[in-house]
Amino acid sequence: MEHFQTISPEQAYQHWQNKSAIMVDIRDPQSFRTGHACGAFHLTNDTLNELMLQANFEQPVMVMCYHGHSSQSAAQYLLNIGFETVYSINGGFEAWRRDYPHAVDSLHNPA
């Protein structure tokens, strides 16, 4: 895959349920602490090496941001550094939280 693909929150949820993809969240630390998809890896410049050491580059990666815009650049970057299949989630965390509130780990709703 040379370019990332965009997927709907529904498609991302199916991957999440099946544990068939890694979920990464690129939002700022405060936003991530306040709430994120259950099991999401908080991807920052400081945690990129950790992801690369832990990840299977053949396993799909789903990238989540606030609304689905910033995740596109991050998705392309992950492809460029060797991940084989990368998705950007349309609507980002806002769509995920709206559609799947039970799949959110937050200060008010711990997983």
UniProtKB/Swiss-Prot annotation:
Catalyzed chemical reaction(s): thiosulfate + hydrogen cyanide = thiocyanate + sulfite + 2 H(+); thiosulfate + [thioredoxin]-dithiol = [thioredoxin]-disulfide + hydrogen sulfide + sulfite + 2 H(+)
Say which enzyme class the record assigns. transferase
Task: Identify which residues the record assigns to the active site.
Answer: 65 (cysteine persulfide intermediate)
Is the keyword Transferase assigned to this protein? yes
Q: Which GO terms describe its cellular component?
A: cytoplasm
Query: Which residue ranges does the record assign to the Rhodanese domain?
Result: 17-105
Q: Where in the cell is it found?
A: Cytoplasm
The record, for SUPFAM superfamilies, names: Rhodanese/Cell cycle control phosphatase
Alphabetical list of CDD domains matching this protein: GlpE_ST
Keyword annotations: Cytoplasm, Transferase
GO terms for biological process, alphabetical: glycerol metabolic process
Question: What is this protein's function?
Answer: Transferase that catalyzes the transfer of sulfur from thiosulfate to thiophilic acceptors such as cyanide or dithiols. May function in a CysM-independent thiosulfate assimilation pathway by catalyzing the conversion of thiosulfate to sulfite, which can then be used for L-cysteine biosynthesis.
- PANTHER family per UniProt: FAD-DEPENDENT OXIDOREDUCTASE, THIOSULFATE SULFURTRANSFERASE GLPE
Its family?
A: Belongs to the GlpE family.
Q: Which protein are we looking at?
A: Thiosulfate sulfurtransferase GlpE
